[in-house]
Amino acid sequence: MKKNYIFIILFTFFSIIGSKLFTFALSFHVLKITGSVQAFSNIMIIYSLIFILGSTSIGYYIDKINKKSFIISMQCISILSIISIFLIPNSLNQLLYIYIIVIILTVTDMAVSLTFNSGLLSLVSERFIDQTVSYRNVIQNVLQIGAPILGGIVYAYFDIKTFMIIMFVTELISLIIVLNIAFNKVLAKKVYEEVKDTFFNSYKVVFKFLKSNKDIFLILLSGSIINFMFGFVTVGIPGSFVTIFNMNSKQLGIIETGFPLAGILFGLIYPKLKNKGTLVANMQVAMIILAVGILILCIPFITDFYKLSILVIYFISIFIIGSGVVLSNVPINIYVQKNVPEQIKGKYLALSQTMSQVMMPFGILVAGILFDFNSVFYIISFSITAILCFILAYLYTFIKKHDGVI
């Protein structure tokens, strides 16, 4: 299991860094060859649509098939598609081919990610699950900061094909790592034999499970609500920072590092904590931290500050918000791994991912309309989101006292 744990950490690094670098370079490349923001926006739309429409379908199948064979096949498809696009003359200067490669790589990345997440506990055991979830989170946050910096340096000297070569190498390394991971073959066979139902009936099993397990239902429901409200925060932070307080893109980049820095710090600390507390306690503290971080965002709207003070306030706020998000997400991911049955875990994770992909963009859409209508909605939305976090913290207490879950 320790060998699997090490291989999964390595796989996480190589699979993410290749995708991050290519996505970063592709955004600049599309804007360069078309001069159209809409062409770039289409890539984001494709990405979101694939996650919304494809997650539940993939979740249905990965609970029924051999996970290792499926991951290997997805990695092979990624590698072959990269080779094909690379060999087609002038393909990366044509939007059609760019959209095709984006679709293929998004589908394969999503499929591999869901498959790994659905079988994580069986791969590393309870002994290493805390470290696996936490350190994967650290890698994601490190690359969130590092990949754009590295990508910018590489893009200044090399063209988009260089990034395709880098991605080909990282995907090939990821494939070699997967081949060395020992999957639980007995479990894969058991799931394949037991789950022989239609698509809709199989998800009825998931909803039945949620109905009888209030703790898992609470995680799914509160996550959806928070994702919707965080659409306002996601748009509101850069929107208010630039348009209301007249800050520049460099300063925006500085404050946005606060979130991944919080993720890195907490991800390194969490596995070493001896008393991690209950899930409800963690979620309560996380909601309070989120509320405090969001309320701090309201301070510059109330009184006048120098630009440096606004920069510091926003950075502190984002760091606190990032701490609250990670304090919530890491224990939740570990809890889900331990308490959702393997036979439906893929479908549950797919359902959760689909709801997140729907709720946050919807929140972003509503926020954009309101913020364009009147800037007063910045402080209103921040205040409402903070109040909602306090309400959720209280509801967790009520459930713990009266229903005895978690």
Kindly label every feature range from the protein language model.
Residues 27-33, 86, 146-166, 243-244, ...:
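Transmembrane alpha-helix termini and helix-breaking/packing motifs in multi-pass membrane transporters
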Residues 25, 160-164, 202-267:
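A single, central transmembrane helix in multi-pass transporters
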Residues 25-51:
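Extracellular/periplasmic helix-loop-helix junction of adjacent transmembrane segments
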Residues 164-194, 396-406:
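Helix-loop junctions on the cytosolic side of multi-pass membrane transporters
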Residues 1-5, 184-221:
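Juxtamembrane intracellular "pre-TM" segments in multi-pass secondary transporters
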Residues 34, 66, 88-92, 300-301:
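Helix-breaking motifs and short loop linkers at transmembrane-helix boundaries and internal kinks
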Residues 7-23, 47-60, 66-78, 97-156, ...:
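Substrate-agnostic recognition of the 12-TM MFS/MFS-like secondary transporter fold
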Residues 53-57, 64, 68-77, 84, ...:
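C-terminal transmembrane bundle of multi-pass solute transporters/carriers
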